[in-house]
């Protein structure tokens, strides 16, 4: 890379002329590059039939693939055979001629790729040169036409020219090479032709040997992978005993080729392998005999050229005058690159030193077009070089590219060059080349003739003169006279002002000099190939010549940390390494804006909101880092459109576009050259401005990422990466910084809101902070950033691997690779951030995610990005994972891998699964209400659209709900935004699941969302599951989050909709039941609920979703006594039914309860409907139960709910209450609906007991009174309406609590003002216990009001209605048969969870209660917000609503006015008590128990068990459903299951939990869609995660 710098143009010319003369070529002007010589030699050899063994170094051209990008070149020696050259072309053919001429007599086979055919005698060098030809249009075209490989073309060309002066079969390779060198003297027609035709693409490869001039100016598809990040070792590999490397290096003016090629850069994209650059000699290129130094130099220079072809800086060889005259344009381009390099190097010198001379390279780096900077030559100042191409070429070449003139280069190239230079030379010493001869010390105006004199003067008179004071008093010194600790430090510092560089490279031909000895030592490694710094990451063997490169690599590749933050006010850039930060400061803020070490180390998080997204743009070096994806890779999440990309690119935060000369330029981030990512993760195909570029920028800047990560708010900057051009990024940076702060809209400008980049925010807590900072309360403001921040802060922090910076090798690898590679240590979500995100979107879910998002399959970043795109539909969130979600992912991973459990999040343990779910769902909730995701068609398996019966508009899934934030692809927790129906729908796999039309959802969303905009943010982000979830818990949490966030049942199950792994019988059962039971029974009830939701458009907000769901349950329970009878059966009976319908799971969940219920469970006339409801409750109860204490602990208001939940979740422990509840429910189920109601009341009473925390007596009474309450329900509708509203209002607190508790209420609460939640809760409670008496109901409200968040939580907490109405309100899933006997109950619960989540609208369609229910189940807050009401209100929607309802057994039935009635069946109830019969009908469908329905008892007990222990067997064994169920259930459910080993013991069939939407179980599992079987399944899940 420093090659040009090392040799002066004159030296090069002399060397070349000497070579040419020696070769007998008098025409120095037309020097052929060594590559040409090699090619000629090869051709000659072939023509002469040189034995194959003679030219072992010649290898067939390597196909261009990942290996090349990663620099992994495998040279397989092969025999060389004679080649028959075609008739020579006379003169310099034109492209047209070339295209018509067949260079090779051997036609390519019909199926053969003319480019991939290995050529027997293409030497490694030629391979390198020719390799790019493959990608070069010109050569490719020509060679393709002739059926030639690029090597063939070169050889043919050489042959044509009669360059067959190779030795006979006895000659040695060294002789051969020497001859080739001689041959190089001949002009190369093709080279000329290529150059003339502008076939730069191929030229870069052939130019060296075909032409005297480097063709780097020709842009090749692969030419700008970006200068290799790895310093290509010019020839260190060729340390043959007979080869005098030292001599070669010193005598070769091109010895710095490696530097020019950026061999130092570690980017795999550069195509360098370790030190070897693609252009470097192949390891196979051995010289048995001493090689002519000149020839070797020629070869090296060729390599250098190659390097440029591969994105390396072309050797700064001065083209012959002839060539210049012929190719002025080419020179301009080529020269630009060298200039760039030199200027980059200069500017990149030492940031510390760059401050002083603004005219130095820094400027040049900043301004690639025409930057005049002094020559790098330290001996004397060199006048500014002319900008003219010729001047540039000559001056630049002569000055080794030190010339400051930068010819116009593509911004990518500039960025690459800059970055490379920076890394190499400048990185070592980013000091601006200064040649000061005048003293500017204070009060000193002495002037000297030479720098030496000045230095002497300063040292003697100023430094040593002021013996005890080591202060720099140089005018305008950035240190501001801050004293140094030692004199030597001041002496070294003064070199920054004087430009003295006493440490000169001792290698011949290298003129590098450094002011710091350490920099020289590092530089010398480029000559020696020494790489003492080995990556410390286990399993990574990469070595680096300097610690900075290693640190950069480790930070980018193995972590998301960006500790180096730009301290310039208003700049939020963050970088992985100090050199990138220095480069950024110097290039973006100017050489004077020096960042001191202290400043660099002062990594306080920046306030910029963008950073909050987790990956600050700063994280993406200049430009790239700046544009670091906002908070989440999911672009969709970020903007609802862009949030999906894991690395959300917050264009707004891009202070300097990667392509822009500013920071982006300074850090030749991949933005300029998408293929070139500092982290190397970016896919080579990515173009500048593309997501990949942005991502690459994020990753590329070595320090950029770090910085970005360091500052959560910098995340927004990531969008900037998206900007196609550097300038655009600049603008975005400035504009977005403001816009990002304002809202998620920042993601809009850059669809890939990269802010979601995974860089860990300073703290996991920062996620919430970010959320709040983003606009915490508001879906719009909070959405993109909140989730991003959430993900970035906690997920990134917790799942640093998640953010794993793209690897240099990520270029071409698919996200799957990246996932496995990167997320191997993290949860599957992270593993396939992108893919998972895409899958969560599901085929049916339309999203902004573009395939580009997954551009970097290998890198998390890439995944991040693609997932971001995929998650466009999803909410906006880094990973859309709250710290709790991240924790759960980590816990899962740890459990699967047997590693130590992750450190529990603070408060995670005390949070109930619901809360965790809420947390998980929060990101979705954070989706701007205004950005409802388009509802994609449900997957075929999902059955009718959620709202098949509703307005025909597909209801948005909870994750699609405005509140839903995008989540990273690897963000399983967060299913696609509520906007996407398919996920949620999949839960039922029956139309029930399908939410109502999205528009209705949007409407409701609009209504409610407004009130609970912050619901998503608050709940999802506010609540963390206090206790660290076990793997199952994590799975459940993820599933819940996924389910909550997930769009459909599938999401609820934690499985991709179509990926939902359910036994065929279960699927059929679900479908039959869903269509039949839901349609018939639950269908009626649910439709009622749906209607209720529809009736309550205001339920639209995410909070509404949660409310709706719960309301629906509530409605079922309380709308009318009869209806409530059925509803209660749906809710109350659901408890039993849940146990029955999802016998294994539910029964296992509450063994004690199961016993009583078990017998009844088996006979579930309407248990399915009820069971579904109960299941929901169980699921949530389990969730809460899972961490019911957690719920209790986390939400104050939830306490009552938690107890409530506990009785239910903890039923095993609170077996009696649960049993009672179950029994009561069951009795109602078995008995009349009313009795069921009454019975349900008992369960509700149990819940009430829990509620008692809320308002034990009241709730208890209310619950017990609920049947009466049925009547009351109608009366309470208004009240409910208020509660709903209230529920929405409490959003922030409620959300947090709710999230903690269940996550569902949060949604409902978050979106709804706290008063509503309170009211809603009371309503729900009322619904649940209509009898609960308005008093009790009111009490609940009062209770809730006191702790509205808690209230919501209580709503959510209890599977049934929140607090008072938890039990009764519990949506009854019975209508929707669970896939298996799990019963639609479980499935319903899952569905409800997923549905509530996914179809917040369904909930919305349902009465507010339903809405609440939805919110409750899935962090419906987010979903609700996102898809507030897409209620399938009337149609099957009713059932879907119910699904939502029973999804949240706990969902509060905060029905807005008449919410009880409105609530799903509640509506029916309200409209007609008969609805209960509908409930019964829905229950009746239960007869079609899902497989293993009767097995329920142990499984159910297990689930119900509060124990955190997770039954992986049960969960995973549940297989498709189990894990889904666990997902649907809270981690507590999972724990309960595990506690009840019965679940483990219970046949996997018995574990009917599969009915729970995949989204509900951990998304990872869902996404992995293979890990739903057991602990082994869990392991499988982990494996899939990885």
From Swiss-Prot:
Keywords: Acetylation, Activator, Cell projection, Cilium, Cytoplasm, Developmental protein, Disease variant, DNA-binding, Holoprosencephaly, Isopeptide bond, Metal-binding, Nucleus, Phosphoprotein, Repeat, Repressor, Transcription, Transcription regulation, Ubl conjugation, Zinc, Zinc-finger. The keyword Phosphoprotein applies. GO terms for molecular function: DNA-binding transcription factor activity; DNA-binding transcription factor activity, RNA polymerase II-specific; promoter-specific chromatin binding; RNA polymerase II cis-regulatory region sequence-specific DNA binding; sequence-specific DNA binding; sequence-specific double-stranded DNA binding; zinc ion binding. Residues 589-605, 968-977 have a biased composition (Basic and acidic residues). Expressed in breast cancers (at protein level). Isoform 1 and isoform 4 are expressed in HTLV-1-infected T-cell lines (at protein level). Isoform 1 and isoform 2 are strongly expressed in HTLV-1-infected T-cell lines. Isoform 3 and isoform 4 are weakly expressed in HTLV-1-infected T-cell lines. Phosphorylated in vitro by ULK3. Phosphorylated by DYRK2; this inhibits GLI2 transcription factor activity and promotes proteasomal degradation of GLI2. Changing residue 1543 to H: No effect on transcription factor activity. Residues 1-10, 342-367, 791-802, 1469-1485 have a biased composition (Polar residues). Residues 1-22, 342-389, 577-636, 650-716, 742-879, 925-1030, 1182-1215, 1421-1441, 1469-1498 are annotated as: Disordered. GO terms for biological process: axon guidance; branching morphogenesis of an epithelial tube; cellular response to virus; cerebellar cortex morphogenesis; developmental growth; embryonic digestive tract development; epidermal cell differentiation; floor plate formation. A zinc finger (C2H2-type) spans 437-464, 475-497, 503-527, 533-558, 564-589. The modification Phosphoserine is found at residues 149, 234, 236, 242, 388, 1011. Changing residue 516 to P: In CJS; loss of DNA-binding; loss of transcription factor activity. PANTHER family: TRANSCRIPTIONAL ACTIVATOR CUBITUS INTERRUPTUS, ZINC FINGER PROTEIN GLI2. It is linked to Holoprosencephaly 9: A structural anomaly of the brain, in which the developing forebrain fails to correctly separate into right and left hemispheres. Holoprosencephaly is genetically heterogeneous and associated with several distinct facies and phenotypic variability. Holoprosencephaly type 9 is characterized by defective anterior pituitary formation and pan-hypopituitarism, with or without overt forebrain cleavage abnormalities, and holoprosencephaly-like midfacial hypoplasia. Belongs to the GLI C2H2-type zinc-finger protein family. Interaction with ZIC1 and ZIC2. Interacts with STK36. Interacts with SUFU; this inhibits transcriptional activation mediated by GLI2. Interacts (via C-terminal internal region) with FOXC1 (via N-terminus); this interaction is direct and increases GLI2 DNA-binding and transcriptional activity through a smoothened (SMO)-independent Hedgehog (Hh) signaling pathway. This is Zinc finger protein GLI2. It comes from Homo sapiens (Human). The gene is GLI2.
């Amino acid at each position: 890379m420093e090659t040009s710098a090392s040799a002066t143009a004159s030296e090069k010319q002399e060397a070349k002329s000497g070579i040419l003369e020696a070769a007998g070529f008098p025409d120095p002007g037309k020097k052929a590059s060594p590559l040409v010589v090699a090619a000629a030699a090869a051709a000659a050899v072939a023509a002469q039939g040189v034995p194959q063994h003679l030219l072992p170094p010649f290898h067939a051209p390597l196909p261009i693939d990942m290996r090349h990008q990663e620099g992994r070149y495998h040279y397989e020696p092969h025999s060389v055979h004679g080649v028959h050259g075609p008739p020579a072309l006379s003169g310099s053919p034109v492209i047209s001629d070339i295209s018509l001429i067949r260079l090779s007599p051997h036609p390519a086979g019909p199926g053969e790729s003319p480019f991939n055919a290995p050529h027997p005698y293409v030497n490694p060098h030629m391979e390198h040169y020719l390799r790019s030809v493959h990608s070069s249009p010109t050569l490719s075209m020509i060679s393709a036409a002739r059926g030639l490989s690029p090597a063939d073309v070169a050889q043919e060309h050489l042959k044509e020219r009669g360059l067959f002066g190779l030795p006979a079969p006895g000659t040695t390779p060294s002789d051969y090479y020497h001859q080739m060198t001689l041959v190089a003297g001949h002009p190369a027609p093709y080279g000329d032709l290529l150059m003339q035709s502008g076939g730069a693409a191929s030229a870069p490869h052939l130019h060296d040997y075909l032409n005297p001039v480097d063709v780097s100016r020709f842009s090749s598809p692969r030419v700008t992978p970006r200068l290799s990040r790895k310093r290509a070792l010019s020839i260190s590999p060729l340390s043959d005993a007979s080869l005098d490397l030292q001599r070669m290096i010193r005598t070769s003016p091109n010895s710095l080729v490696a530097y020019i090629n950026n061999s130092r850069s570690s980017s795999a994209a550069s195509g360098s392998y370790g030190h070897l650059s693609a252009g470097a000699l192949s390891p196979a290129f051995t010289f048995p005999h001493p090689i002519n130094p000149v020839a070797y130099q020629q070869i090296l220079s060729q390599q250098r050229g190659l390097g440029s072809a591969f994105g390396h800086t072309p050797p700064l060889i001065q083209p012959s005058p002839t060539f210049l005259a012929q190719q002025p344009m080419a020179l301009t381009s080529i020269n630009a690159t060298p200039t760039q390099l030199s200027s980059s190097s200069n500017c990149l010198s030492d940031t510390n030193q760059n401050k002083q001379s603004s005219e130095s390279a820094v400027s040049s780096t900043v301004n690639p077009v025409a930057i005049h900077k002094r020559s790098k030559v330290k001996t004397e100042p060199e006048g500014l070089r002319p900008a003219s191409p010729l001047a540039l070429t000559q001056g630049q070449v002569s000055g080794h590219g030190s010339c400051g003139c930068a010819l116009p280069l593509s911004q990518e190239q500039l960025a690459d060059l800059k970055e490379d230079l920076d890394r190499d030379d400048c990185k070592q010493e980013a000091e601006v080349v200064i040649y000061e001869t005048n003293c500017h010390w204070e009060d000193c105006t002495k002037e000297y003739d030479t720098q030496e004199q000045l230095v002497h003067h300063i040292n003697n008179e100023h430094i040593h003169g002021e013996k005890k004071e080591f202060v720099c008093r140089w005018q305008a010194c950035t240190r501001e006279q801050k004293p140094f600790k030692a004199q030597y430090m001041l002496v070294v510092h003064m070199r920054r002002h004087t430009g003295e560089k006493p440490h000169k490279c001792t290698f011949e031909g290298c003129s590098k000099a450094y002011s710091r000895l350490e920099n020289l030592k590092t530089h010398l490694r480029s000559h020696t190939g020494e790489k003492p710094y080995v990556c410390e990451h286990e399993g990574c063997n990469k070595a680096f010549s300097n610690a900075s490169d290693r640190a950069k690599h480790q930070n980018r590749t193995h972590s998301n940390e960006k500790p180096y933050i730009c301290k310039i006010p208003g700049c939020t850039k963050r970088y992985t390494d100090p050199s990138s930060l220095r480069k950024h400061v110097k290039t973006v803020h100017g050489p004077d804006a020096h960042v001191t070490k202290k400043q660099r180390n002062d990594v306080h998080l920046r306030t910029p909101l963008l950073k909050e997204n987790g990956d600050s743009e700063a994280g993406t070096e200049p430009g790239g880092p700046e544009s670091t994806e906002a908070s989440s890779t999911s672009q969709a999440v970020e903007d609802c459109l862009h949030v999906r990309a894991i690395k959300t690119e917050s264009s707004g935060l891009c202070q300097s576009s990667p392509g822009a000369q500013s920071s982006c330029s300074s850090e030749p981030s991949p933005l300029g050259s998408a293929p070139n990512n500092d982290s190397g993760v970016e896919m080579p195909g990515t173009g500048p401005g593309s997501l990949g570029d942005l991502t690459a920028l994020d990753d590329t800047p070595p320090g950029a990422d770090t910085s970005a990560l360091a500052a959560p708010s910098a995340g927004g900057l990531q969008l900037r990466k998206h900007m196609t051009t550097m300038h655009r990024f600049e603008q975005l940076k400035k504009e977005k910084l403001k816009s990002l702060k304002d809202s998620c809209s920042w993601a809009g400008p850059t669809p890939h809101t990269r802010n979601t980049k995974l860089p860990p925010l300073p703290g996991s807590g920062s996620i919430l902070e970010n959320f709040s900072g983003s606009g915490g309360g508001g879906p719009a403001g909070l959405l993109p950033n909140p989730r991003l921040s959430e993900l970035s802060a906690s997920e990134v922090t917790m799942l640093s691997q998640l953010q794993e910076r793209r690897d240099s090798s990520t270029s071409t690898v698919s996200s799957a690779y990246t996932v496995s590679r990167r997320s191997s240590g993290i949860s599957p979500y992270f593993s396939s951030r992108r893919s998972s995100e895409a899958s969560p979107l599901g085929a049916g879910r339309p999203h902004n995610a573009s395939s580009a998002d997954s551009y970097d399959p290998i890198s998390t970043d890439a995944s991040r990005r693609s997932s971001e795109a995929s998650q466009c539909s999803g909410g906006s969130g880094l990973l859309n994972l709250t710290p709790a979600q991240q924790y759960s992912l980590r816990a899962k991973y740890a459990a699967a891998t047997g590693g130590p459990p992750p450190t529990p999040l603070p408060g995670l343990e005390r949070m109930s699964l619901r809360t965790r779910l809420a947390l998980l769902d929060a990101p979705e909730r954070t989706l701007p209400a205004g950005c409802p995701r388009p509802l994609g068609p449900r997957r075929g398996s999902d059955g009718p659209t959620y709202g098949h019966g509703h307005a025909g508009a597909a209801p948005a899934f909870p994750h699609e709900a405005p509140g839903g934030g995008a989540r990273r692809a690897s963000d399983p927790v967060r299913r696609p935004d509520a906007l996407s129906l398919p996920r949620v729908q999949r839960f039922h796999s029956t139309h029930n699941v399908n939410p109502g039309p999205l528009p209705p959802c949007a409407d409701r969303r609009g209504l409610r969302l407004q009130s609970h905009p912050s619901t998503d943010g608050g709940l999802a982000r506010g609540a963390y599951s206090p206790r660290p979830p076990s793997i199952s818990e994590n799975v459940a949490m993820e599933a819940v989050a996924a389910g909550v966030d997930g769009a459909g049942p599938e999401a609820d199950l934690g499985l991709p909709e179509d990926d939902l792994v359910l036994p065929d019988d279960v699927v059929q059962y679900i479908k039959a039941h869903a269509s039949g039971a839901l349609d018939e029974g639950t269908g009626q009830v649910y439709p009622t609920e749906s209607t209720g939701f529809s009736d309550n458009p205001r339920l639209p907000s995410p909070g509404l979703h949660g409310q709706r769901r719960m309301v629906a349950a509530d409605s079922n329970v309380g709308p009318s006594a009869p209806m409530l009878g059925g509803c209660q059966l749906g809710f109350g009976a659901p408890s039993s039914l849940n146990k029955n319908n999802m016998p294994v799971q539910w029964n296992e969940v509450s063994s004690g309860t199961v016993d009583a219920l078990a017998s009844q469970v088996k006979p579930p006339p309407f248990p399915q409907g009820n069971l579904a409801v109960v299941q929901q409750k169980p699921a949530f109860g389990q969730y809460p139960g899972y961490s019911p204490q957690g719920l209790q602990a986390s939400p104050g208001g939830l306490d009552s709910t938690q107890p409530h939940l506990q009785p239910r979740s903890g039923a095993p422990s609170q077996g009696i209450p649960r049993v009672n509840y179950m029994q009561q429910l069951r009795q109602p189920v078995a008995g009349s609906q009313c009795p069921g109601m009454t019975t349900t009341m008992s369960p509700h009473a149990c819940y009430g007991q829990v509620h008692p925390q809320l308002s034990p007596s009241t709730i208890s009474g209310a619950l017990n009174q609920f049947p009466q309450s049925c009547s009351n329900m109608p009366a309470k509708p208004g009240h409910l309406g208020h509660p709903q509203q209230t529920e929405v209002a409490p959003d922030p607190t409620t959300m947090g609590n709710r999230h903690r508790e269940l996550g569902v209420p949060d949604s409902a609460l978050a979106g709804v003002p706290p008063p509503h939640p309170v009211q809603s809760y009371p309503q729900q409670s009322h619904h649940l216990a209509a009898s609960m008496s308005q008093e009790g109901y009111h009490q609940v409200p009062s209770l809730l009001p006191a702790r509205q968040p808690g209230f919501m939580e209580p709503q959510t907490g209890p599977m049934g209605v929140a607090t008072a109405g938890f039990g009764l309100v519990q949506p009854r899933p019975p209508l929707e048969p669970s896939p298996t006997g799990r019963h639609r109950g479980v499935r319903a619960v899952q569905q409800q969870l997923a549905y509530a989540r996914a179809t917040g609208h369904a909930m919305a369609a349902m009465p507010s209660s339903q809405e609440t229910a939805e919110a409750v189940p899935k962090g419906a807050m987010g979903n609700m917000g996102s898809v507030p009401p897409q209620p399938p209100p009337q149609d099957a929607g009713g059932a879907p609503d119910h699904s939502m309802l029973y999804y949240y057994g706990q969902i509060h039935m905060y029905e807005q006015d008449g919410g009880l009635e409105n609530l799903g069946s509640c509506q029916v109830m309200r409209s007609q008590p008969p609805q209960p019969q509908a409930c019964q009908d829905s229950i009746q469908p239960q007869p079609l128990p899902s497989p293993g329905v009767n097995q329920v008892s142990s499984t159910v007990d297990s689930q119900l068990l509060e124990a955190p222990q997770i039954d992986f067997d049960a969960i995973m064994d549940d297989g498709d459903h189990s894990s889904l169920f666990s997902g649907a259930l809270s981690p507590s459910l999972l724990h309960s299951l595990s506690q009840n080993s019965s679940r483990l013991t219970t046949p996997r069939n018995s574990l009917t939990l599969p009915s729970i939407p995949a989204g509900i179980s951990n998304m990872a599992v869902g996404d992995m869609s293979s890990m739903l079987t057991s602990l082994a399944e869990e392991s499988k899940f982990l494996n899939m995660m990885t």
